[in-house]
Amino acid sequence: MKKLTKVLLVAGSVAVLAACGSSKKDESAGQMFGGYSVQDLQQRYNTVYFGFDKYNIEGEYVQILDAHAAFLNATPATKVVVEGNTDERGTPEYNIALGQRRADAVKHYLSAKGVQAGQVSTVSYGEEKPAVLGHDEAAYSKNRRAVLAY
């Protein structure tokens, strides 16, 4: 009977400790990366905008992408999909290719900052998923983007 009590006590302790454990993602939730919280990176600062027919990353996005790189390096189990998008000008085929170049530019930037290739995948939606509907420069500028989707 004493042996059974000890076994049950040990098993119960292990179960309680296992229930208290948290995942790596949970542990990073309160941390800051480059001055940004994980929630901000995933919801507010997850978009890089591009100029017309461009796919180079402008300086204003370096700090944000550095923060994403720091987060991804600190949480190697985390994965992100970089979604490349364009405005409606150009042929669908051209826009798919341009959206892919935008997504690849972000992926290569993150890779250069030490993020593992398996953590980042890319997809191009071209003009198919506009952030803003409209046929003017204000709408177009919001649609020329790459989104980091966690």
Swiss-Prot record:
Keywords, sorted A to Z: Cell cycle, Cell division, Cell outer membrane, Lipoprotein, Membrane, Palmitate, Signal
Membrane topology reported for the UniProt record: Lipid-anchor
Lipidation residue positions, type N-palmitoyl cysteine: C20
UniProt cross-references to CDD domains, sorted A to Z: OmpA_C-like (cd07185)
Any Pfam family hit: OmpA
Residue ranges constituting the OmpA-like domain according to the UniProt record: 37-150
Coiled coil: none
Gene3D superfamilies named among the record's database cross-references: OmpA-like domain
Lipidation (S-diacylglycerol cysteine): C20
Origin superkingdom: Bacteria
Signal sequence bounds: 1-19
GO biological process terms, semicolon-separated: cell division
A GO CC annotation given for this chain: cell outer membrane
Keyword presence, Lipoprotein: yes
UniProt-annotated location(s): Cell outer membrane
PANTHER family in the record: LIPOPROTEIN YIAD-RELATED, STATOR ELEMENT OF FLAGELLAR MOTOR COMPLEX
Known partners and oligomeric status: The Tol-Pal system is composed of five core proteins: the inner membrane proteins TolA, TolQ and TolR, the periplasmic protein TolB and the outer membrane protein Pal. They form a network linking the inner and outer membranes and the peptidoglycan layer.
Its job: Part of the Tol-Pal system, which plays a role in outer membrane invagination during cell division and is important for maintaining outer membrane integrity.
Protein family (similarity comment): Belongs to the Pal lipoprotein family.
Protein's name in the database: Peptidoglycan-associated lipoprotein
Gene giving rise to this polypeptide: pal
